[in-house]
């Protein structure tokens, strides 16, 4: 079983809202997931506090046990929008 940290799309047409989830890679994008880690709202400006919220401790846990982040989640980490540094 390959576990991925990825975005699951929700919201209305032309008003996307994403959940950051941990899911089996074989499951559909918006299907069943193992754990909800947070959410991402691309309709808000980056400075808004609700633009991207993630449970950092759970993200670190899943990365430590071998879950693979998708391209977009990796981009968030590289840009510093999600911090994986020790507090």
UniProtKB/Swiss-Prot annotation:
<dbReference type="GO" id="GO:0006412">
    <property type="term" value="P:translation"/>
</dbReference>
<dbReference type="InterPro" id="IPR023803">
    <property type="entry name" value="Ribosomal_bS16_dom_sf"/>
</dbReference>
<keyword id="KW-0689">Ribosomal protein</keyword>
<dbReference type="GO" id="GO:0003735">
    <property type="term" value="F:structural constituent of ribosome"/>
</dbReference>
<dbReference type="GO" id="GO:0005737">
    <property type="term" value="C:cytoplasm"/>
</dbReference>
<dbReference type="Pfam" id="PF00886">
    <property type="entry name" value="Ribosomal_S16"/>
</dbReference>
<dbReference type="InterPro" id="IPR000307">
    <property type="entry name" value="Ribosomal_bS16"/>
</dbReference>
<comment type="similarity">
    <text>Belongs to the bacterial ribosomal protein bS16 family.</text>
</comment>
<dbReference type="GO" id="GO:0015935">
    <property type="term" value="C:small ribosomal subunit"/>
</dbReference>
<keyword id="KW-0687">Ribonucleoprotein</keyword>
<dbReference type="InterPro" id="IPR020592">
    <property type="entry name" value="Ribosomal_bS16_CS"/>
</dbReference>
<protein>
    <recommendedName>
        <fullName>Small ribosomal subunit protein bS16</fullName>
    </recommendedName>
</protein>
């Amino acid at each position: 079983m390959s576990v991925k940290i990825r975005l699951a799309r929700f919201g209305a047409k032309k008003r996307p809202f994403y959940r950051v989830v941990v899911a089996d890679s074989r499951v559909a994008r918006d299907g069943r997931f193992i754990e909800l880690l947070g959410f991402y709202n691309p309709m808000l400006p980056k400075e808004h506090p609700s633009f991207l919220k993630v449970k950092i401790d759970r993200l670190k846990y899943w990365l430590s046990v071998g879950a693979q982040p998708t391209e977009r989640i990796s981009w968030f980490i590289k840009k510093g929008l999600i911090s994986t540094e020790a507090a």
